[in-house]
From Swiss-Prot:
It is an enzyme of class 3 (hydrolase). This is Structural polyprotein. Specific enzymatic cleavages yield mature proteins. Capsid assembly seems to be regulated by polyprotein processing. The protease VP4 cleaves itself off the polyprotein, thus releasing pre-VP2 and VP3 within the infected cell. During capsid assembly, the C-terminus of pre-VP2 is further processed by VP4, giving rise to VP2, the external capsid protein and three small peptides that all stay closely associated with the capsid. The record marks 442-443, 486-487, 495-496, 508-509, 734-735 as: Cleavage. The keyword Hydrolase applies.
């Protein structure tokens, strides 16, 4: 990433390949050119309207895919053509590697006489090879993957699909493009030689058993010996030797033809056939051999190969009964290789795009763009300017971290074209460090991208600790970029813009490093990561290192390194994963950046950054972003570990340089910085003066206090054998440490009391108050987390005040208000029983689900405090309105002025409501209730009940009417 532009150019080229190529910012710095190649095809749809596109999105060469058509009955595939870049790259370039690639697949051309396009597209990215796909039908394509970012289904052909290549790895090598080599003038016509693509070939080997060959059906008819899957898209070489013998001497000379056929995806017609023939006679029938030796160039691979078949045939009818047995002179086998087959992207992954029900003779357009890093051939190189690749850890690891979150950021390998076009704006924002990410905010990604930027973008020293868990140890970040400008060596990381990033140097030498900087220590130690606690080692030794950075000249700070047996390279940062050897290969050490000039004890050790020593002897180590330790102190510590320490870890830190007599320790520089690092762990520094403990002034009394407990201290076996005074130091320092420090503490306190200084008096009071209230450990941990006392200053800036009287209502009033509020909400929800008094008895809680169901089912008020869990899953069967039931019963039974319905009829209506879950009767139930009412009304009266007789009405006179007055035939 260039410093002149705040843009992640490599990531932009991956996301938006049409914007052009950008150099891969890894540590492969070959001179190369950048080139963009296009691919454009108008594929005609067959009569079946269905077909298949096989895409190789990561292939580093010119072949980017293939097109197949289904036959009219859609029972078999038919190969149509390769899909390639517009220029055959191997004609002008020797090596290359792919940067990015994209395909757009859609249809927009109407055949004559049509006014609308039909058809849909299915697409899926498969992590395996083409031969591993079980079914290639349109509907089964979606079962290739369960990842939603890797498939699209039922997209209209007019809308289109976009296939985007996402890297499957980094630090990929340049691949030979199978260019032809120059040849002499006497070469015969047609003869040529090429450099095969064999950096990482995929090799296949057919091993045949030492058994009888299957019997052939007739002469000239091949009989299959073996068939299986194999993926080949470019040149291959076949070698092999099939040895066999016959049971009896052949009557006539018999020719055995062993045939190796390379088959495609569509049919059983061989793409390439390799045949090896041998003549079996009476002289060699007990040990005949057929040898394969043939090279097949890429031009002969006319379509993708997915299968191979090995068969044999005879030319003599009489030889059919004379059985042949394999393995007469050794194992029978045939092998062949697929050039570049194991390079990521060549054979896997693949993307399959199937189309269906398209109009015959319509055109399916494939438009692709591929970006490459290419190395020209010698002729072209004379007239073309090439440039070195730039190692840009920020740009590379920003791309890695973004792609490692592709699920959260919804970065797909297969897109609906309109969705990809909508997403291009967000991609441009992600690759622009100056953008405030407004579009990403709308998608909900801004916080994630900002977090990645904070880790990846500021400086290299803050990048790798956070990135390591995401991208692993794939990058050997520093590589061979080493400048040895001192005894310790210095590792530098150079960015594309020409500036150096902060990479901590680990000094264990006597060179002048600089003055102690607390600010630098705080800033860089905050990047440490991945702490691991190890059980108490069998033995070990501790030595200090001094760290510096290029961006802060003259500043330094120290840390400790513990060397223990066994190999633990996985506990080291990738920058420190360096293996050094003792003299004459008598042992090795991980984490030391230079070979050891003396012999070891044939053991392997590891130098680990020390975080903490536990009371039980366990050690806590951590990963730090720094180079491996070097210099005299590391050699001194290793000499002690190999020759003088048999068990345990001495509770002290060793520094110095071994003199030529291998006994005296020569003082070295940087002792004050190393002493501070040792005191932070409560350990003394040994070796700054011959035979005398360090005498370094320190302003902090607490830094001299040694933690409780003790690690086992090994007494030197044969004192003064290697280093003078070592045995005396190791015996006396640890044993007299506690008494000496107690005297030092008492003397310091006595001197402090004599000083009439208010500040000292306050400090003493503060120490006493801290110890009295058992706050020492808490304050110490706080000081490590808040070294500048920013948070603590805010916390204690306002002293505590007397408790004020609470404002507002008292507790009883507040609870009553709470009960009233809950009661109102419960009544609104249908719990009429939930009065404020009931809520108070229910511990000021509303009705539980069980209590509410109990009331709805039984109609009774639940007891406060009981949960009625048995009623939670019961259905509500009790009718909620008894007045409604009574009115309905009276209405069905009779008119309002008649007598009310009997209790039996009420019960029948209640049962109907209960059966309906509280709802009224339906039409059939209503008719049943009417029939029941009529039956109840017709019930016979008891026998003792007399039927009341009524007086019959008086009969009217025959001549009277209401229009004539009564009388004896009077006239009107």
């Amino acid at each position: 990433m260039s410093t002149s532009k705040a843009t992640a150019t490599y990531l932009r080229s991956i996301m938006l390949p049409e914007n052009g190529p950008a150099s891969i910012p890894d540590d492969i710095t070959e001179r190369h050119i950048l080139k963009q190649e296009t691919s454009s095809y108008n594929l005609e749809v067959s009569e079946s309207g269905s077909g298949l596109l096989v895409c190789f999105p990561g292939a580093p060469g010119s072949r980017v895919g293939a097109h197949y058509r289904w036959n009219l009955n859609q029972t078999a595939l038919e190969f149509d053509q390769w899909l390639e870049t517009s220029q055959d790259l191997k004609k002008a370039f020797n090596y290359g590697r792919l940067i990015s690639r994209k395909y757009d697949i859609q249809s927009s051309t109407l055949p004559a006489g049509l006014y609308a396009l039909n058809g849909t597209l299915n697409a899926a990215t498969f992590e395996g090879s083409l031969s591993e796909v079980e079914s290639l039908t349109y509907n089964s394509l979606m079962s290739l993957t369960t990842n939603p970012q890797d498939k699209v289904n039922n997209q209209l052909v007019t809308k289109g699909i976009t296939v985007l290549n996402l890297p499957t790895g980094f630090d990929k090598p340049y691949v030979r493009l199978e260019d032809e080599t120059p040849q002499g003038p006497q070469s015969m016509n047609g003869a040529r030689m090429r450099c095969t693509a064999a950096i990482a070939p995929r090799r296949y080997e057919i091993d045949l058993p030492s058994e009888r060959l299957p019997t052939v059906a007739a002469t000239g008819t091949p009989t299959t010996i073996y068939e299986g899957n194999a993926d080949i898209v470019n040149s291959t070489a076949v070698t092999g030797d099939i040895t066999f013998q016959l049971e009896a001497e052949p009557v006539n000379e018999t020719r055995f033809d062993f045939i190796l056929q390379f088959l495609g995806l569509d049919n059983d017609v061989p793409v390439v056939t390799v045949t090896s023939s041998t003549l079996v006679t009476a002289d060699n029938y007990r040990g005949a051999s057929a040898k394969f030796t043939q090279s097949i160039p890429t031009e002969m691979i006319t379509k993708p190969i997915t299968r191979v078949k090995l068969a044999y045939q005879l030319n003599q009818q009489t030889a059919i009964a004379n059985a042949a047995t394999l393995g007469a002179k050794g194992p029978a086998s045939v092998s062949f290789s697929s050039g570049n087959g194991n390079v990521p992207g060549v054979l896997r992954p693949i993307t399959l795009v199937a189309y269906e029900k398209m109009t015959p003779q319509s055109i399916l357009t494939v438009a692709g763009v591929s970006n490459y890093e290419l190395i020209p051939n010698p002729d072209l190189l004379k007239n073309m300017v090439t440039k070195y690749g730039k190692y840009d850890p920020e740009g590379l690891n920003y791309a890695k971290m973004i792609l490692s979150h592709r699920e959260e950021l919804d970065i797909r390998t297969v897109w609906r074209t309109e969705e990809y076009k909508e997403r291009t704006r967000a991609f441009k924002e992600i690759t622009d460090f100056t953008s405030d990410l407004p579009t990403s905010k709308a998608w909900g990604w801004r916080d994630l991208v900002r977090g990645i930027r904070k880790v990846a973008a500021p400086v290299l020293s803050t990048l790798f600790p956070m990135a390591a868990p995401l991208i692993g140890a794939a990058d050997q970040f520093i590589g061979d970029l080493t400048k040895t400008n001192s005894a310790g060596g210095r590792y530098l990381s150079h960015a594309a813009g020409g500036r150096y990033h902060d990479v901590m140097d680990s000094w264990a030498s006597g060179s002048e490093a600089g003055s102690y900087s607390k600010h630098l220590k705080t800033r860089l130690e905050s990047n440490n990561y991945e702490e691991v606690e190890l059980p108490k080692p069998t033995k070990g030794v501790i030595f200090p290192v001094v760290h510096t950075v290029e961006s802060a000249p003259g500043e330094a700070f120290g840390s400790l390194v513990v060397v223990i047996p066994e190999a633990y390279p996985e506990l080291l940062d990738p920058n420190q994963q360096v293996l050094s050897y003792f003299k004459n290969d008598t042992g090795c050490v991980w984490g030391i950046g230079e070979d050891i000039p003396f012999e070891g004890d044939d053991m392997c050790y590891t130098a680990l950054p020390l975080k903490e020593i536990k009371r039980n002897g366990n050690i806590v180590v951590e990963k730090i972003f720094a180079g491996p330790a070097m210099g005299p102190s590391s050699q001194l510590a290793l000499s002690l570990l190999v020759n003088d320490i048999d068990e345990g870890i001495p509770r002290m830190v060793f520094t110095g340089e071994i003199a030529d007599d291998e006994e005296t320790v020569i003082p070295i520089c940087g002792v004050d910085i190393k002493a501070i690092a040792a005191h932070e762990h409560g350990l003394p520094l040994i070796g700054c003066q011959p035979g005398v403990d360090e005498m370094v002034a320190n302003t902090s009394l607490a830094s001299h206090l040694i933690q409780g407990g003790a690690l086992p201290v090994q007494k030197a076996q044969g004192a003064c054998r290697r280093i003078k005074y070592l045995g005396q130091l190791m015996r006396t320092t640890a044993s007299g440490m506690d008494a000496e420090l107690q005297g030092l503490l008492q003397a310091t306190m006595a001197r402090a009391k004599e000083v009439k200084d208010a500040e000292v008096f306050k400090l003493l009071k503060l120490m006493s108050w801290t110890r009295k209230n058992d706050l020492t450990d808490h304050m110490y941990e706080w000081s490590k987390e808040d070294p500048d006392a920013i948070k603590f200053g805010r916390l204690v800036s306002t002293p505590p005040k007397h408790q004020e009287k609470p404002k507002g209502p008292d507790q009883h009033t507040a609870q009553e208000a709470k009960a009233t509020r809950i009661s109102l909400d419960a009544v609104k929800a249908g719990a009429d029983f939930a009065s404020p008094e009931w809520i108070a008895e229910n511990n000021y809680r509303g009705p539980s689900p069980g209590q509410f169901k109990y009331y709805m089912i039984t109609g009774r008020v639940p007891n406060p405090g009981e949960e009625y869990e048995d009623y939670v899953r019961k259905p509500i069967t009790r009718p909620t309105d008894m007045d409604k039931i009574r009115r309905l019963a009276n209405s069905v039974y009779g008119l309002p002025h008649q007598e009310p319905a009997p209790d039996d009829f009420y019960q029948a209506v209640v049962e109907v409501f209960a059966e309906n879950g509280g709802r009224g009767p339906d039409q059939d139930q209503m008719q049943d209730l009417r029939d029941l009412a009529r039956q109840m009304k017709r019930r016979p009266r008891p026998a003792e009940t007399r039927r009341q007789t009524k007086t019959p009405p008086r009969a009217a006179t025959s001549s009277g009417s209401r229009f004539t007055p009564s009388g004896d035939d009077g006239e009107v």
